Structures are given as structure tokens and as C-alpha cells.
Amino acid sequence: MKQKLLELILTHAYRYSEQPFTLASGKKSRHYFNCKEITLVPDRLELLCKFIVERHLDESGILKPQAFGGLTMGADPICYGISLEFRKQDKNIYPLIVRKFSKDHGTNKLVEGAVHEVKSCVIVDDVITTGGSTIQAIRSMRDSGIVVVQGVCILDRQEGGMDAILAEGVQMFPIFKKSDFGNLEHE
């Protein structure tokens, strides 16, 4: 399963360009991993979430919490998919979505989902570069009274994000690291 995911990422999500891409972190890179090409395609998302639930959690020592959540939009489909995989085992593991900004109407909540049912959460992201988006989600979860126990992401770009997140007290367990994709040309 993991090898198939790696091949799908290389085929569908990875892009190289002489003209650098601007990443969410603001950094520039000729290497771009658009994991939404995995998470927004049903059969690819299903394979990803099945791998996370059936293999990655146990192999990484990730505790099974009450919820999986992260910053919209990278985490959204992954959290929903993981929740549905657990439903196949007759377990309710809730998806939580963290907004980037609170709305100026309604409840003004940053964290959406069954927050009242949840005390602990595994934080989720698709790609981590500097860790800024993940840290924003962790802080919003904590402000909502949720303990973030650990984290999972599809790809660690190996640019300092894991250390920044660990400094927040959360250990991340990436499925892949950029180095897993071979000797990509240096920046």
C-alpha cells in the first residue's frame, strides 16, 4: 500500500519547474507536492486513509484519539476519510476542521465538528514545510480545550517544520519524507 501511495504521489502530486513555485509558507521551490491530487480523488483518498488507519498509526505508535483534525483545506478530506475508515470498524472517530479565520457571524468558532465530544486529537496536514499551518491548527485546538496528542502528515518536505511543531510539544509522524522520492535536484 505504501509503495502504491508513493507512486501515486510521484505520478499525480509531484511537479518540477525551473520557475519556482511559491509554497504556503512563502518559501520558493522548484519542487512542488500538491497532495490535493491525492486527497481530492476518491480512490486515492481511500487508499491513503486505509493505509493510515490499518498500518501507519500502529507502525508509528500514534495513539488512537477521539478525533483527527487540522487546518482547512489540506486536512479536511484526510480527516473525513480517516473517520469513515474507522466507521467501517464500527468506531466513531470524529473529524475536526480548523478554520484559518473565525467567521464574523454565527458562533465565531475556529474549530468545527463534534468539539463537545472530543478531549484529544491527532493533528493532520497534507504537506509540511515550515510547520506554520500545522502550528496554527494546534493552537486553535488547544484554545478550544482539545489536547493535541500527536500528528500525521502525508509529506515532510524536510525544511524544519517537524522541529518547529515539536517545539509546540507535538510529535509528527509523516508517511513520507521528501528524501523518500529519490535524489530530487537541489534547490
From Swiss-Prot:
It is an enzyme of class 2 (transferase). It catalyses: orotidine 5'-phosphate + diphosphate = orotate + 5-phospho-alpha-D-ribose 1-diphosphate. InterPro entries: OPRT, Or_phspho_trans_dom, PRibTrfase_dom, PRTase-like. Disulfide bonds: none annotated. Pathway: Pyrimidine metabolism; UMP biosynthesis via de novo pathway; UMP from orotate: step 1/2. Its EC number is 2.4.2.10. Keywords: Glycosyltransferase, Magnesium, Pyrimidine biosynthesis, Transferase. It comes from the Bacteria. The keyword Transferase applies. GO terms for molecular function: magnesium ion binding; orotate phosphoribosyltransferase activity. Orotate binds at residues 129, 157. The keyword Transmembrane helix does not apply. PROSITE patterns: PUR_PYR_PR_TRANSFER. GO terms for biological process: 'de novo' UMP biosynthetic process; pyrimidine nucleobase biosynthetic process. 5-phospho-alpha-D-ribose 1-diphosphate binds at residues 99-100, 103, 105, 125-133. It holds the Pfam family Pribosyltran. Its cofactor is Mg(2+). Belongs to the purine/pyrimidine phosphoribosyltransferase family. PyrE subfamily. Homodimer. NCBIfam families: pyrE. Catalyzes the transfer of a ribosyl phosphate group from 5-phosphoribose 1-diphosphate to orotate, leading to the formation of orotidine monophosphate (OMP). This is Orotate phosphoribosyltransferase. The lineage of its organism: Bacteria, Pseudomonadati, Spirochaetota, Spirochaetia, Leptospirales.
